[in-house]
């Protein structure tokens, strides 16, 4: 009876399932994901507040099969050890995603080992310009904002803001070694209609 009263109190109003994840990142964070109940749509975004640097997981209990949680499907391109913090979704409730490939992961982990005190993340930004209308740039950063989505794989962390991410969601982040030099690159952007040969500039539908 006590359990039933507690559940009624927790889930008063629109039913929802809440998962709280605490992940050690550049800044201490708390990630809260709200999933729909019944015909309610999935929450479009997940906010992070800096309060703790300890990773735990709390899930409200499933009672009488009342809460049906749909498993999200990601492409097989997603590595098993990659996950997302401060997740953002499109208008259909589909999460935006960047695939951190092995080459990018290894290079970012090397950078993290050389300068662990800097807590650097790789920031991907899309600006207007270039020969095709939009251009992609990469830089190392040591700040994560409320509008950023963080893609974590091992010690590698890739960040994109809520303006850039919708234009490149589904792309792969690689680190390439070429005769002209080594660099991070954004490849196989499904949102791009055309792109330049150097994978820096693109246009969209």
Curated annotation (Swiss-Prot):
Its main localization is: mitochondrion
| A GO molecular function held by the record | 4 iron, 4 sulfur cluster binding
Instruction: Extract the coiled-coil ranges from the record.
Output: none
Q: Which family does it belong to?
A: Belongs to the HesB/IscA family.
Q: Which PROSITE patterns does the UniProt record give?
A: HESB
- What's the name of its gene? isa2
UniProt keywords (A-Z) are: Iron, Metal-binding, Mitochondrion
Gene Ontology terms describing biological process:
[4Fe-4S] cluster assembly; iron-sulfur cluster assembly
- This one is known as Iron-sulfur assembly protein 2
Q: Which residues cross the membrane?
A: none
- Residues involved in Fe cation binding: 131, 196, 198
* GO CC annotation: mitochondrial [4Fe-4S] assembly complex; mitochondrial matrix; mitochondrion
Q: What is the lineage of its organism?
A: Eukaryota, Fungi, Dikarya, Ascomycota, Taphrinomycotina
* Key word Mitochondrion present: yes
